[in-house]
Amino acid sequence: MAIKLIVGLRNPGSAYEQTRHNAGAWLVTALAQRHNSHFKIDKKMQAELTEIDINNHPCRLALPLTFMNHSGQTTRIISQFYKIEPGEILIVHDELDLPVGRIKLKTGGGHGGHNGLRDITAQLGTGEFHRLRIGIGHPGHKDLVHQYVLSRPSMHDRQQIYDAIDRGIAIIPIVLSGDMARAMNQVNA
């Protein structure tokens, strides 16, 4: 099934823009820029939206205007309005359980403690959507997670995350075609 909607998870606002938790939005923003596509605020959809077309595969890109914990609301509104099935959605998000700079493509599964994924699963009524997980590393103890994800990465970590974003963007044409197995083999290797 071809992907018709890519959502980059984030917390909106300049205070959060450069934090680890916004790594998903970094990728979606970079993808739009590389295709000379510009986001426009759509209050009805509760998101900044744009469209790209790669090899005759059109796709909407969304950056929620809601905070991370309410990402599902935005995703549900957009998917219902445009009649997009959960299996046609790719959620791009930060991942504590991957080392900094690793990237993995996954279909379905649980939320793994990620509040954005938790809300998307609840709002869509299923976890059967695709996820592109960008490794941000783990602070070492669960009590440090909140502060860690809302902090800015070091220059070294930021560069590793940017490198992962480049690898993620490289597989988007394959993802949009619906060949998830090939995309997974390429990015998860």
Swiss-Prot record:
GO molecular function annotations of the record: peptidyl-tRNA hydrolase activity; tRNA binding
Coarse class of the protein's main subcellular location: cytoplasm
Annotated protein name in UniProt: Peptidyl-tRNA hydrolase
Catalysis performed (reactions): an N-acyl-L-alpha-aminoacyl-tRNA + H2O = an N-acyl-L-amino acid + a tRNA + H(+)
Residue numbers binding tRNA: Y16, F67, N69, N115
Site keyed Stabilizes the basic form of H active site to accept a proton: positions: D94
GO CC term, one of those recorded: cytoplasm
Role this protein plays: Hydrolyzes ribosome-free peptidyl-tRNAs (with 1 or more amino acids incorporated), which drop off the ribosome during protein synthesis, or as a result of ribosome stalling.
RNA-binding recorded as keyword: yes
SUPFAM superfamilies noted in UniProt: Peptidyl-tRNA hydrolase-like
Assembly and binders: Monomer.
GO process annotations (BP): protein quality control for misfolded or incompletely synthesized proteins; rescue of stalled ribosome
Residues under site feature: Discriminates between blocked and unblocked aminoacyl-tRNA: N11
Xref: PROSITE patterns: PEPT_TRNA_HYDROL_2
EC number, UniProt record: 3.1.1.29
Xref: Pfam families: Pept_tRNA_hydro (PF01195)
Keywords noted in UniProt: Cytoplasm, Hydrolase, RNA-binding, tRNA-binding
Recorded family membership: Belongs to the PTH family.
NCBIfam families assigned: pth (TIGR00447)
Top-level taxonomic group: Bacteria
Localisation: Cytoplasm
InterPro entries linked to this entry: Pept_tRNA_hydro, Pept_tRNA_hydro_CS, Pept_tRNA_hydro_sf
Enzyme's top EC category: hydrolase
Residues annotated as the enzyme's active site: H21
